[in-house]
Curated annotation (Swiss-Prot):
Reactions catalysed, as given in the entry: N(tele)-phospho-L-histidyl/L-threonyl-[pyruvate, phosphate dikinase] + ADP = N(tele)-phospho-L-histidyl/O-phospho-L-threonyl-[pyruvate, phosphate dikinase] + AMP + H(+); N(tele)-phospho-L-histidyl/O-phospho-L-threonyl-[pyruvate, phosphate dikinase] + phosphate + H(+) = N(tele)-phospho-L-histidyl/L-threonyl-[pyruvate, phosphate dikinase] + diphosphate
Top-level enzyme category: transferase
Keywords (A to Z) from UniProt: Kinase, Nucleotide-binding, Serine/threonine-protein kinase, Transferase
Family: Belongs to the pyruvate, phosphate/water dikinase regulatory protein family. PDRP subfamily.
Residues of the signal peptide: none
Record protein name field: Putative pyruvate, phosphate dikinase regulatory protein
Length: 273
């Protein structure tokens, strides 16, 4: 088997890097065979900072820069430095801004406030992240009634990364693993005004993921974890529980975390109305 292509992806912004990171990760979903080393450079607003970034870049590797930069002089300097080292340097918003400017025949603002505001939305997001981390993998269910969303599923169905992604969007999430022969410690059927959703996956894909997990943990002797009949029983039980309670179930086999989260948000929004 040939070695995967390794890409050093440098995300540069004069703000938080949230926008450029979201675009970059969505784009890289189309290149599953590429191994990405992500470097995040936020709050970059001086020539000196750009010089330091360039010094850290290993020039003999595959490097790629994606950025958002609103100061024209700093942006030109970044492009110049990247060009000297023959590193692709892509502005993710320039084309969109230019198209809007041309269509409306209005020049873009010379300056926008890119500072991180500590507003209510910020604190809501931080609270959601803290809550979700504390309730990962079925922990601390004593205050599960404070959750917005409850995610169920067998092991390795992207429950945790999906929960964190949703938390970053401001949702308080609990994720609970479904394990054969072990009953849930809480009665979810009595939960009111909570979105409860199950995650399922193709059995062959799940076994493949679990085998890789066992190898990484050097625990290949855990045969039950990857036994076909055992795994099939787990998946069927998840579907049975969700069907019995009328909870939606999402097949995550061909979905990214972003796609899973988007589907859950659609269910949540529909429930709210």
């Amino acid at each position: 088997m040939s070695n995967p292509v390794v890409l050093n992806l440098h995300l540069i912004s004069d703000s938080t890097c949230e926008t450029v990171a979201a675009v970059a990760r969505s784009a890289l979903e189309h290149f599953k065979s590429v191994e990405v080393n992500e470097f995040v450079w936020s709050c970059i607003n001086s020539y000196e900072q750009i010089d330091k970034i360039m010094l850290t870049i290993e020039k003999d590797k595959y490097n790629f820069i994606m950025y958002t930069m609103f100061d024209d002089d700093i942006r030109k300097y970044l492009k110049q430095k990247a060009g000297i080292h023959e590193i692709p340097c892509i502005p993710i918003l320039s084309h969109v801004i230019r198209e809007i400017s041309c269509y409306l025949n209005i020049k873009k603002d010379p300056y926008i406030n890119t500072s991180i505001g500590l507003d209510d939305e910020y604190f809501t997001r931080i609270d959601a992240i803290n809550y979700t981390i504390a309730h990962d993998d079925g922990q601390n269910l004593w205050d599960i009634d404070q959750a917005d969303i409850i995610i169920l599923g067998v092991s390795r169905t992207s429950k945790s990364p999906t929960s964190i992604y949703l938390a970053y969007r401001g949702y308080r999430v609990v994720n609970i693993p479904l394990i054969n022969s072990i009953e849930l410690s809480v009665d979810l059927s009595k939960m009111k005004n909570k979105l409860i959703v199950g995650l399922t996956i193709d059995i062959d894909r799940l076994i493949e993921i679990r085998r890789a997990r066992l190898v990484s943990m050097k625990n290949q002797n855990n045969y039950g974890y990857v036994d076909y009949e055992h795994v099939l029983m787990e998946i069927r039980e998840t579907k049975r529980i969700c069907a019995k309670n009328g909870w939606p179930i999402i097949d995550v086999t061909q979905k990214s975390v972003e796609e899973i989260a988007a589907t859950i948000i659609q269910y949540f929004t529909k429930m709210q109305h």
